[in-house]
Design a protein with these regions (language model features):
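Bacterial N-terminal signal peptides that target proteins for export
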Residues: 2-16
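Bacterial N-terminal signal peptides
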Residues: 15-26
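Acidic, metal/ion-coordinating pockets
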Residues: 33-347, 392, 397-404, 417, ...
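Feature captures C-terminal
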Residues: 42-47, 57, 65-72, 76, ...
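Short, solvent-exposed loop/turn motifs
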Residues: 196, 385-387, 493, 519
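Acidic, glycine-rich low-complexity/disordered segments
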Residues: 353-374
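Glycine-rich phosphate/diphosphate-binding loops and the adjacent beta-loop-alpha structural elements
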Residues: 370-394
Length: 583
């Protein structure tokens, strides 16, 4: 062999080898072959259907709209869940709290037993506990879980005692001060083929500022992220890699009207909680703010995490399609997706199972709730558009309640009354809802409007303390709602300037405070009425709780409203010029 031929052969071989290397690199870099397909049978599909803030909306009468479309209510939510489950081998229905409490009269008059019965019929599997589950205290929450007759009202159907919830409520971050025990399980594990999936239930840490203190005495509400993170190694020690948090806390965003899948400018507590959560937690199902969103938020390791919220009152269902990998027993985030579905009544047929529950309770409700208590001349609405969406503005509804409470406690010398916006749960609408006649307000409607059964208290406050309360409308940084606008009684006025930046109230100024046209004396003492929730410092109005001196009992807040409507009918919407917003 000549040396020239050998050199040619060697050169040719090198060229062939180089070509093969380049070809292999090109193929490896092509999208079609960037990743080998998963071997058959290694992936498990798990559908999660999620909702939050049901608030006892068994009937559809006042569940509300999505855009212009009437939506929600138990009968239609149940049908939507059944529709979405079709074709899915593995499916769970989960919730993020506030399933009961703050409910319309149809459920609330009966301590939300109709609500739990409807949730059982829908096939709910597991839920976190929200702040409203504590409205009647820990003992009543345990009755709602386990069953039994109400300690005061007894059994509504003697031959059919309340059976409790078929689903499991979870609350990992609520602990007994003395024992450190939780009132309900902290987590729940379900197996799909060979893969265990854990659900951690979380109540918002601020619950002790949102419910009456007497019902939660002796219980601590811990940081959500710290509690969840502490459970991760406990779950992993049991072989669990796929971890979902059901969290009753949320955020805010600014979508277009009717848009339920956006995640635009997401802000609020959920952002900081997401940042603080262990990256081992794969999904967060959230609630509390009554807003829909469908987000992919980066966890602390930079990986995308699904975070959803599904509005309120059964108006939206979040469908989370999880892909589980048998090789890791974990969630394949790159393959998992989420979508929010509207529960539009016109597109659905009521579920007969829920209709049967409604029919069962209707005769009792007709007796208790259909009695007329007064009349109105037009709608008396909450703040925002749609109504009830903004607790940071003055509203006719809030001022009406304050007027009623001032009038009702006048015998105790009351001069000013304040009402928290979250205590007004619906509008009083002029159009008839159930055949009672236009303008007629029934006891059931009054209950739905103001359902918590608080006690009115009248006590002395200095002018300076009153101004401090008004400044506390500007909520602490990180609160779910940056500003909570108190309803104020007629004759009380002031000027207000506030700044809201990136979902937080950053400044507030209260000036020109007057009572019946006379400037408030900062050193003088005035008789103020508030419900016991506010008087105990609820909603971060801490000044109320520090006021010294006696507190005079003014009776039940709902009865104050009912008697006011009966005395002054027809009642017109109070003005919303009691507070002059300067900016």
């Amino acid at each position: 062999m000549s040396s020239t031929f050998a050199r040619v052969r060697r050169s040719t071989a090198l060229l062939v080898a180089l070509f093969m290397v380049l070809a292999t690199m090109a193929l490896a870099g092509s999208p079609a072959d960037a990743k080998k397909p998963d071997p058959p049978g290694q992936l498990v599909q798990l559908q999660l259907l999620a909702f939050n803030d049901y608030h006892g909306h068994v009937k559809d009468t006042d569940a509300g709209n999505i855009g212009e479309d009437p939506s929600g209510g138990g009968e239609y939510l149940s049908t939507k869940l059944k529709e979405l489950r079709q074709g899915n081998k593995y499916t769970l229905t989960v919730a993020a709290g506030d399933l009961i409490g703050g409910s319309p009269a149809f459920s609330g008059l009966f301590h939300d037993e109709p609500s739990v019965e409807s949730l059982n019929a829908m096939g709910l599997d597991v839920s976190s506990v929200g702040n409203h589950e504590f409205d009647e205290g820990v003992t009543e929450l345990l009755r709602m879980q386990d069953g039994g007759c109400h300690p005061l009202d007894g059994c509504y159907f003697p031959d059919e005692p309340y059976a409790g919830a078929d689903f499991q409520w979870l609350s990992a971050n609520v602990v007994n001060e003395a024992t450190g025990e939780t009132p309900l399980p902290p987590y729940w594990i379900e197996r799909f083929e060979s893969i265990d999936v854990a659900f951690i239930g979380m109540t918002l840490e601020a619950t002790d500022t949102l419910v009456a203190a007497v019902g939660i005495e002796g219980w601590d509400f811990l940081d959500e992220a710290e509690t969840a993170n502490a459970l991760v190694p406990i779950l992993k020690a049991q072989g669990v890699e796929a971890i979902i948090v059901l969290l009753h806390e949320g955020g805010s965003q600014t979508p277009a009207p009717g848009e339920i899948n956006a995640c635009e400018g997401i802000s609020g507590p959920i952002v900081a909680i997401n940042d603080a959560l262990d990256p081992e937690i794969d999904v967060m199902v959230t609630g509390h703010t009554h807003l829909p969103y469908n987000c992919l938020l980066e966890d602390a390791s930079g990986q995308p995490r699904i975070v959803t919220s599904s509005y309120s009152y059964g108006r939206v269902v979040s469908e989370i399609d999880l892909v589980l990998d048998k090789r890791t027993d974990d969630v394949r985030r790159d393959l998992s997706t989420a979508q929010n579905h509207a529960v539009v009544r016109a597109e659905l047929t009521p579920d007969p199972a829920i209709t049967k529950i409604i029919d069962k309770w209707t005769p009792l409700f007709d007796v208790a709730g259909s009695t007329p208590v007064g009349t109105i001349t037009e709608n008396i609405n909450r703040g925002g558009a749609p109504t009830g969406s903004d607790r940071g503005v003055e509203s006719p509804a809030g001022n009406l309640v304050a007027d009623a409470q001032l009038w009702s406690t006048s015998a105790n010398g009351a001069q000013i009354a304040f009402m928290n916006p979250g205590g007004v749960r619906s509008d009083l609408t002029y159009a008839q809802s159930d055949g009672e006649g236009d303008g007629v307000v029934t006891f059931g409607e009054a209950f739905t409007f103001q359902p918590f059964g608080n006690t009115l208290l009248t006590f002395g406050m200095t002018g300076a303390e009153i101004v401090s309360v008004l400044e506390e409308q500007c909520q602490p940084a990180g609160s779910s709602r940056p500003f909570l606008h108190l309803g104020v009684s007629e004759g009380f006025t002031y000027d207000l300037a506030k700044t809201i930046e990136t979902g937080n109230c950053t400044s507030v100024s209260v000036t020109n405070v007057q009572l019946d046209g006379v400037p408030l004396d900062m050193n003088a003492v005035y008789a103020v009425t508030a419900n016991n929730f506010l008087a105990d410092g609820g909603d971060n109005f801490g000044t109320f709780a520090t006021v010294a001196g006696p507190r005079l009992d003014g009776g039940n807040d709902l009865l104050a409203l009912v008697n006011y409507l009966g005395t002054f009918s027809p009642v017109s919407p109070p003005s919303t010029d009691r507070v002059n917003e300067l900016n």
